[in-house]
Each structure stands twice: as structure tokens, then as C-alpha cells.
Regions:
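N-terminal, polar/charged subdomain of small-to-medium soluble alpha/beta proteins
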Residues: 2-111
Length: 111
């Protein structure tokens, strides 16, 4: 599934959601879209976001895995988390990516 969001400067960030071996609900896709677009407030140069969702081991409680890869100008960032819900895993990923984007932005500014 491909979702595109328009930014203030008319630059489009592409959000690609891939659910492996299941169909993601519209509610889950809307949640992911909302969380990923919030990452733009930490760094302007996000070009593309690739979100991968999969069930790791059905017999355990923490079996929902989410991975988010952000393509940004001059590099990329990646986070992967496992939780008992996809929402929790996506939350963990976006929290980790916020920190990465802040560090990346500071690194660029210091050059």
C-alpha cells in the first residue's frame, strides 16, 4: 500500500506499509501514517518511509514486529521493535527514530 502526504513545502513524503502474511486494518494503517508523519517535525528531509509489519512467533505473547526505515537526505535511519501489539511496536520504533533524527540533524548542523 502506498500513502503520500504533502508537506508545507510541497515535498511529498512517501509512506509504504507492508504487512507480511496478513492484511493490516485501515485503523492500523491510519495509526502508522499518523505516527510516521509526526517524525517530520524532527527532520525536514524525510523522503520515504518503509514500514514492515509481521507476526514473529504466534505462540508467544510478544509476537508483533514492526520495522521502520526512513530515507532522508544524505542517509537513512532504521528501527525495529517487537511488542504484543503492532501499535506498541510502531510506538517503540517512532520513539527510537525520533532520537536518531535529532542526532542526525545535529550531526549535519555541526559540519
Amino acid at each position: 500500500m502506498l500513502i503520500q502526504e504533502r508537506k508545507k513545502k510541497e515535498v511529498i513524503m512517501e509512506i509504504r506499509i507492508q504487512a507480511i502474511h496478513f492484511d493490516a486494518s485501515d485503523q492500523l494503517q491510519a495509526f502508522i501514517q499518523k505516527k510516521v508523519t509526526k517524525l517530520e517535525q524532527y527532520f525536514d528531509g524525510i523522503i520515504k518511509a518503509e514500514v514492515t509489519l509481521k507476526v514473529v512467533k504466534p505462540e508467544t505473547s510478544n509476537n508483533k514486529q514492526a520495522g521502520i526505515r526512513l530515507l532522508v537526505r544524505n542517509g537513512d535511519c532504521f528501527a525495529e521493535k517487537i511488542d504484543n501489539t503492532f501499535e506498541g511496536a510502531v510506538d517503540g520504533c517512532t520513539d527510537a527514530l525520533e532520537k536518531q533524527l535529532v542526532k542526525f540533524k545535529e550531526k549535519i548542523r555541526s559540519k
